[in-house]
A protein has these predicted regions:
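Membrane-embedded alpha-helical segments of multi-pass membrane proteins
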Residues: 56-64, 131-139, 232-233, 245, ...
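Juxtamembrane helix-loop-helix connectors linking adjacent transmembrane helices
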Residues: 104-242, 330-332
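Alpha-helical transmembrane segments
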Residues: 15-34, 91-102, 190-195
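Hydrophobic alpha-helical transmembrane segments
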Residues: 21, 89, 93, 185-189, ...
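Functionally important transmembrane alpha-helices
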Residues: 267-332
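Membrane-interface helix/loop boundary segments of multi-pass membrane proteins
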Residues: 148, 166, 173-189, 211, ...
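Membrane-interfacial, low-structure loops and terminal tails that flank and connect transmembrane helices
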Residues: 1-14, 73-90, 151-180
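Alpha-helical transmembrane segments in multi-pass membrane proteins
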Residues: 39-71, 81-151
């Protein structure tokens, strides 16, 4: 745990520039203000649901957020060479295109209507909505990793923080941080444990119980002839899975993978884009994603693994589900 705190301190010491961080904060404030004042995502972008232009609008939003923050980093660090780097455009373009397809994907609606004659549409819709990332994010990134992401040799690889030759970070087997690492597990476990009392307190609030659990009784268990806990478990597994592609793309591909191009500069642009994917959420949650995204990004760069972020994200999500289930069960 001490090692990770030292890594975080070292990252801030090397990466922090008052002018860069202030400019990035202003850029974030502008994006947040425009989105929530004009309700850009909910009232405009989402009005194109089931329309081929829907993912294109997400692409415009995310590209603006990401490339704007990259420009700030290259400007203050005097790194115009980044914009002439083919690898930068290949990686950033891949991430932007496929995440925008994921955000604006609506094929699962059709699949849910067609499977089983649409008799369990609601259950299939909620499950397939969480699983569609297998096609839209995980598979494309895996193909990119296998066929486009050439591993640099030790003599030609650019300097990357915490890079140690001969480790799994240098071998093709580590798919953008998917290889588990012991480093940081104690810290991540502690961070998750600290959330338990907060989740417990939140579970007594009416607003919380109005949103959680996200699982809803759709009578799918009656259709399949199984106890309801079976359909609830299937849904919760699908729900938990949806955090995997988010961590894989943002902390894995955009931080660990992009470090070959930007080094420590991968974190800030990732944070801005990560904030933008929360624009449809309450403002407090969106703002908090900035701090969480920054911390998880630095730790992913340090550990060369996304498992810490997965542990925290999935743990909190399932913790809120369990707390809500217990509250509603106790009221019956």
């Amino acid at each position: 745990m001490k090692t990770l705190w030292r890594d975080l301190r070292d990252h801030i010491r090397v990466d922090f520039r008052p002018d860069l961080y202030a400019a990035t904060a202003l850029w974030l404030a502008l994006l947040l203000s425009v989105n929530y004042y004009f309700d850009v995502e909910d009232s405009y972008i989402d009005s194109f649901q089931d329309d081929p232009r829907w993912p294109l609008l997400y692409l415009a939003l995310y590209a603006t957020a990401y490339y704007g923050s990259v420009w700030l980093w290259t400007h203050f660090h005097r790194r115009p060479d980044v914009w002439r780097n083919r690898d930068f455009w290949l990686r950033s373009g891949t991430a932007l295109v496929f995440y925008s397809i994921y955000a604006g994907f609506y094929g699962h609606v059709v699949w849910s209507q067609q499977l089983f004659g649409g008799q369990v549409f609601a259950f299939l819709y909620y499950c397939l909505r969480n699983l569609q990332s297998l096609l839209t994010i995980v598979l494309p990134l895996y193909l990119f990793y296998k066929f486009a992401d050439r591993q640099p040799s030790e003599s030609t690889a650019p300097e990357c923080p915490h890079r140690r030759t001969g480790t799994t970070a240098d071998r093709p087997g580590n798919f953008y941080g998917m290889a588990p690492k012991r480093k940081g597990l104690v810290l991540y476990g502690l961070m998750l444990a600290l959330m338990i009392p907060l989740i417990t307190l939140a579970s007594f609030q009416p607003d919380f119980l109005a949103s959680y659990p996200t699982y809803k009784d759709t009578n799918a268990n009656e259709f399949f002839g199984v106890p309801e806990w079976v359909t609830a478990l299937i849904y919760e597994l699908c729900y938990g899975w949806d955090f995997v592609p988010t961590e894989l793309l943002f902390r894995g591909f955009l931080v660990i993978g992009m470090a070959r191009v930007l080094g420590r500069g991968t974190v800030l642009p990732m944070v801005v884009w990560y904030c933008a994917i929360h624009f449809g959420r309450p403002p407090g949650e969106t703002i908090s994603s900035v701090f969480g995204g920054y911390l998880l990004g630095v730790l992913a760069l340090s550990t060369r693994s996304i498992w810490g972020g997965l542990l925290i994200h999935v743990g909190i999500a399932w913790g809120m589900e369990i707390a809500a289930f217990l509250q509603k069960t106790g009221d019956q």
